Amino acid sequence: MCKRGHIIAAHSHSHKVLTDISLEDVKYELSTNKDYLETIIGRPVETISIPNGSYSADVLKIVIDVGFQSIYTSKPSTKVETFHGKDLIGRYAIMHNTKADDVVKIISSATLRTWMRYRYEILKFARQALGQYYYKIRTTILRYFVKL
């Protein structure tokens, strides 16, 4: 994939929520994953997608210290922000079952993109308010609906 021009990005070693673990563990999660990927593909991995979209200024500092140049977040946005000179790039979630027509709607509808940003902010607030319980509640709800 890499030879065909795909960007190989890191995501963390074990997909932990980076804001829920110690900064020492954050560094381990990121550097271990980065080193592992670089060994496999034989070139630098300079891009990361933050697991679960959860980060803080301290986490971002470690991301940069580990050597990442571009940082993808889960924040729905068309704007590129910067943190200590590095790009923070938001994105819109396109899942395996997202239809092409829905992608076109996201691209062409500012109203839909605004709604998606509001949804993101509401869920972000819920994650912050519920802490580690957010993911447990979310998993329980998803399991219930998947069974239906």
Question: What is the predicted role of each segment?
Answer:
Residues I8, T47-I48:
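Conserved alpha/beta-hydrolase fold motif
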